Protein backbone atom coordinates (compact mmCIF):
# COMPACT_ATOMS: atom_id res chain seq x y z
CA UNK A 1 0.00 0.00 0.00
CA UNK A 2 1.34 3.41 -0.95
CA UNK A 3 0.05 6.51 0.78
CA UNK A 4 0.89 9.67 -1.13
CA UNK A 5 0.43 13.41 -0.99
CA UNK A 6 0.86 15.44 -4.14
CA UNK A 7 0.33 19.13 -4.75
CA UNK A 8 1.84 19.75 -8.19
CA UNK A 9 1.75 16.20 -9.57
CA UNK A 10 5.42 15.33 -9.04
CA UNK A 11 4.78 13.02 -6.09
CA UNK A 12 1.71 11.50 -7.73
CA UNK A 13 3.90 10.57 -10.70
CA UNK A 14 6.52 8.99 -8.42
CA UNK A 15 3.87 7.08 -6.44
CA UNK A 16 2.30 5.84 -9.68
CA UNK A 17 5.67 4.55 -10.91
CA UNK A 18 6.15 2.68 -7.61
CA UNK A 19 2.61 1.35 -7.69
CA UNK A 20 3.01 0.00 -11.21
CA UNK A 21 6.40 -1.57 -10.40
CA UNK A 22 5.24 -3.22 -7.17
CA UNK A 23 1.52 -3.83 -7.81
CA UNK A 24 0.76 -1.96 -4.58
CA UNK A 25 -2.42 0.07 -4.07
CA UNK A 26 -2.22 3.90 -4.02
CA UNK A 27 -4.22 5.96 -1.54
CA UNK A 28 -4.25 9.76 -1.44
CA UNK A 29 -3.56 11.16 2.03
CA UNK A 30 -5.62 14.24 1.11
CA UNK A 31 -8.64 11.98 0.52
CA UNK A 32 -8.00 9.51 3.36
CA UNK A 33 -7.45 12.10 6.12
CA UNK A 34 -11.19 12.81 6.23
CA UNK A 35 -12.03 9.17 6.94
CA UNK A 36 -11.04 6.85 9.78
CA UNK A 37 -7.52 6.25 8.35
CA UNK A 38 -7.57 2.49 8.82
CA UNK A 39 -4.94 0.55 6.89
CA UNK A 40 -5.57 -3.15 6.23
CA UNK A 41 -2.43 -4.72 4.77
CA UNK A 42 -2.73 -7.93 2.79
CA UNK A 43 -0.32 -10.84 3.22
CA UNK A 44 3.16 -9.66 2.29
CA UNK A 45 2.02 -6.13 1.49
CA UNK A 46 4.46 -3.30 2.18
CA UNK A 47 3.63 0.09 3.66
CA UNK A 48 4.99 2.98 1.60
CA UNK A 49 4.74 6.74 1.77
CA UNK A 50 5.45 9.07 -1.17
CA UNK A 51 5.61 12.65 0.02
CA UNK A 52 6.69 16.05 -1.30
CA UNK A 53 9.21 18.14 0.60
CA UNK A 54 7.82 21.62 1.28
CA UNK A 55 9.82 23.90 3.55
CA UNK A 56 12.20 21.05 4.47
CA UNK A 57 9.91 19.61 7.14
CA UNK A 58 6.91 17.31 7.50
CA UNK A 59 3.65 19.04 6.60
CA UNK A 60 0.93 19.20 9.30
CA UNK A 61 -1.46 17.09 7.17
CA UNK A 62 1.15 14.30 6.95
CA UNK A 63 1.78 14.40 10.70
CA UNK A 64 -1.96 14.35 11.42
CA UNK A 65 -2.49 11.46 9.01
CA UNK A 66 0.30 9.33 10.50
CA UNK A 67 -0.91 10.01 14.04
CA UNK A 68 -4.47 9.08 13.02
CA UNK A 69 -3.46 6.01 10.97
CA UNK A 70 -4.54 2.67 12.44
CA UNK A 71 -2.62 -0.25 10.96
CA UNK A 72 -3.94 -3.80 10.74
CA UNK A 73 -1.68 -6.37 9.17
CA UNK A 74 -2.11 -10.05 8.50
CA UNK A 75 -0.06 -12.40 10.67
CA UNK A 76 2.15 -13.20 7.70
CA UNK A 77 2.91 -9.52 7.06
CA UNK A 78 3.63 -8.49 10.65
CA UNK A 79 4.43 -11.92 12.19
CA UNK A 80 1.88 -10.89 14.84
CA UNK A 81 -1.21 -8.73 14.57
CA UNK A 82 0.10 -6.57 17.43
CA UNK A 83 3.70 -6.36 16.15
CA UNK A 84 3.74 -3.85 13.29
CA UNK A 85 7.48 -3.11 13.46
CA UNK A 86 8.09 -6.06 11.12
CA UNK A 87 5.98 -4.54 8.35
CA UNK A 88 8.24 -3.54 5.48
CA UNK A 89 7.91 0.25 5.72
CA UNK A 90 9.56 2.70 3.34
CA UNK A 91 9.25 6.22 2.07
CA UNK A 92 10.17 8.18 -1.02
CA UNK A 93 10.46 11.96 -0.86
CA UNK A 94 10.26 14.27 -3.86
CA UNK A 95 12.08 17.59 -3.72
CA UNK A 96 13.24 20.37 -5.98
CA UNK A 97 16.66 20.48 -4.38
CA UNK A 98 17.23 19.10 -0.88
CA UNK A 99 15.10 17.42 1.76
CA UNK A 100 16.40 19.29 4.80
CA UNK A 101 15.43 17.36 7.93
CA UNK A 102 12.24 15.91 6.43
CA UNK A 103 13.53 12.32 6.34
CA UNK A 104 14.63 12.39 9.98
CA UNK A 105 11.33 13.93 11.11
CA UNK A 106 9.26 11.46 9.09
CA UNK A 107 11.23 8.47 10.32
CA UNK A 108 10.71 9.63 13.93
CA UNK A 109 6.95 9.96 13.35
CA UNK A 110 6.82 6.44 11.91
CA UNK A 111 8.98 5.07 14.74
CA UNK A 112 6.66 6.71 17.27
CA UNK A 113 3.82 4.85 15.52
CA UNK A 114 5.65 1.56 16.13
CA UNK A 115 6.92 1.15 12.57
CA UNK A 116 10.53 0.52 11.61
CA UNK A 117 11.59 2.18 8.35
CA UNK A 118 13.53 -0.25 6.15
CA UNK A 119 14.19 2.01 3.15
CA UNK A 120 14.14 5.72 2.50
CA UNK A 121 15.09 7.64 -0.61
CA UNK A 122 14.59 10.96 -2.32
CA UNK A 123 13.94 11.92 -5.90
CA UNK A 124 14.93 15.31 -7.26
CA UNK A 125 12.10 16.68 -9.37
CA UNK A 126 11.63 19.97 -11.24
CA UNK A 127 11.67 22.85 -8.75
CA UNK A 128 8.18 24.11 -8.03
CA UNK A 129 8.57 25.81 -4.65
CA UNK A 130 8.12 29.58 -4.84
CA UNK A 131 7.24 30.31 -1.21
CA UNK A 132 10.25 32.55 -0.64
CA UNK A 133 11.26 35.60 -2.70
CA UNK A 134 14.69 34.21 -3.64
CA UNK A 135 13.34 30.88 -4.89
CA UNK A 136 12.29 30.41 -8.48
CA UNK A 137 11.01 27.46 -10.43
CA UNK A 138 13.49 25.72 -12.70
CA UNK A 139 13.98 27.15 -16.18
CA UNK A 140 12.63 24.97 -19.00
CA UNK A 141 16.13 23.74 -19.92
CA UNK A 142 16.81 22.46 -16.38
CA UNK A 143 13.46 20.64 -16.27
CA UNK A 144 14.49 18.54 -19.27
CA UNK A 145 17.70 17.31 -17.59
Regions found by a protein language model. Give the residues of each.
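FMN-binding flavodoxin-like domain, especially the glycine-rich phosphate-binding loop
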Residues: 1-2, 6-33, 37, 41-145
Amino acid sequence: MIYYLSCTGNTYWAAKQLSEATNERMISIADAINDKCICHLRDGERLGFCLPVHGWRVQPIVEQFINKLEIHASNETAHSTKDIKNIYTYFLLTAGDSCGEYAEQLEQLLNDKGLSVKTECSLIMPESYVGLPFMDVDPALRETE
